[in-house]
Amino acid sequence: MSDRPLCDAVVILCTAPDDACAQRLANSLLETRLAACVTLLPGARSLYYWEGKLEQQSEVQMLIKSDTSHQQALLTHLKQQHPYDTPELLVLPVSGGDSDYLTWLNASLR
């Protein structure tokens, strides 16, 4: 068994309807130190069923880097600030990564 601590980093996936909204959400998460980094990927296209109808929408995919201790507050914050009734909020655990990056991530959230 390894003596290395388990990684507590998470990546949260969220989509936003446009660049301005994604930027506003990202700034809010960074200012409150709920996220260490937010990557905005414009040009995403989402296809899904909503209320029985097939929908297709251009969106901005957000990759939000945080940790488990900030996870619930971050999800709550996004639900309160997001314009969608049911925003995409998916938490992906990080099983490992570059130790320098993970150290920076943790320090950025303090």
Swiss-Prot record:
* Entry cofactors: Cu cation
Q: Which GO terms describe its biological process?
A: response to metal ion
GO function terms (MF aspect): copper ion binding
Please indicate if the UniProt record lists Metal-binding as a keyword.
yes
Q: Which SUPFAM superfamilies match?
A: GlnB-like
A cellular-component GO term for this protein: cytoplasm
**Where do the annotations place Cu cation binding?**
C14, H82
Q: Where in the cell is it found?
A: Cytoplasm
State how the cofactor is bound: Binds 1 copper ion per subunit.
Q: Principal place where this protein is found?
A: cytoplasm
Q: Which UniProt keywords apply?
A: Copper, Cytoplasm, Metal-binding
Under the heading InterPro entries, the entry gives: CutA_Enterobact (IPR023700), Ion_tolerance_CutA (IPR004323), N-reg_PII-like_a/b (IPR011322), N-reg_PII/ATP_PRibTrfase_C (IPR015867)
Quaternary structure and partners: Homotrimer.
Any idea what job this protein has?
Involved in resistance toward heavy metals.
Q: Which family does it belong to?
A: Belongs to the CutA family.
State the protein's name.
Divalent-cation tolerance protein CutA
Task: Write down the species.
Answer: Pectobacterium atrosepticum (strain SCRI 1043 / ATCC BAA-672)
